[in-house]
Amino acid sequence: MKNFNPIMGNNNMPEYISVISSSQCARIRIDDIEVIEQEGRKLHVITPDREYSFYESMKEIIPVLACRAFYRPIRGLIINFDHVKEITGNMVSFHSGQCVTMGKNSITRTRTAYKKYLLRYPPYSLGEGGEYAPMIAAERSRPELS
């Protein structure tokens, strides 16, 4: 039996998932999800406000998250780049204060994917001599429009 059900929005993409378990029934806005962790057969869906736990497999929930900023660095973890504040060392920090620690290889792949995600949203800076430094310098030297 499915313990969650996607609720479709106007653009034919799911906006919410309904979570049904023996102890709770809830409707979670997909864009509010920060982290999804798998612990055995149980999924923990973490939002800035609370954590929801229910029995379901990752493969059932992944299609619902398609075409959004979700990234799966390891088999039992999905993070939402829209909620990431920063990635430092081996830790991903979220705007809500939640943190996720990863191993060296996983954090390297996650950092690379997060950089690609961030490059979709200018302005950005890679510092002196970075790949985009000439483009940024040209923007700064352009006279202001009146």
Please identify what each model-predicted range represents.
Residues 2-146:
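Basic, polyanion-interacting recognition surfaces, primarily
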